[in-house]
Curated annotation (Swiss-Prot):
Signal peptide: none annotated. Transmembrane segments: none annotated. Belongs to the UPF0251 family. InterPro entries: UPF0251 (IPR002852). This is UPF0251 protein Mevan_1492.
Length: 130
């Protein structure tokens, strides 16, 4: 039996599972493409920094991990996405060591969702009020 050295690995917090789990070049069957696996925490790191525009420190806090671990996840994600785009590979999104973050109305306090979620609990309630 192998034992892991160092501190125990903690679950990474992600906001939501993606709507799609595969991206591929158009016109080429999946079985003819090489693929790159992008974990859900790698996708979340890209979303928080490159899409939402959070700093690395804020994004690491959002995911419940250290900045060093966050940076390693983000670096890995960017390398995989770059490889897929440059070399025409399929991106398969899935797996990882994560937990879905629980967003609550008290945390948002009427402000835009700090996690950049369109389907946040608060936003769902606003839509129902209309």
């Amino acid at each position: 039996m192998q034992f892991r050295k160092g501190r125990p690995k903690i679950l990474r917090l992600i906001s939501e599972e993606p709507k799609f789990n595969i991206f591929k070049p158009v016109g080429i069957p999946k079985n003819e493409l090489e693929s790159v696996v992008l974990t859900l925490e790698e996708l979340e790191s890209l979303r928080l920094v490159d899409y939402v525009g959070q700093s690395h420190e804020d994004a690491a806090d959002s995911m419940g991990i250290s900045r060093r671990v966050f940076w390693n996840i983000l670096k890995s994600a960017r390398k995989k996405v770059s490889d897929a785009l440059i070399n025409g590979k399929m991106i398969d999104i899935g797996g990882g060591y994560y937990q879905i973050r629980k967003c609550n109305e008290q945390e948002c306090q009427g402000m835009p969702c700090r996690f950049g979620l369109s389907n946040c609990f608060k936003n769902k309630n606003k839509d129902n009020e209309l």
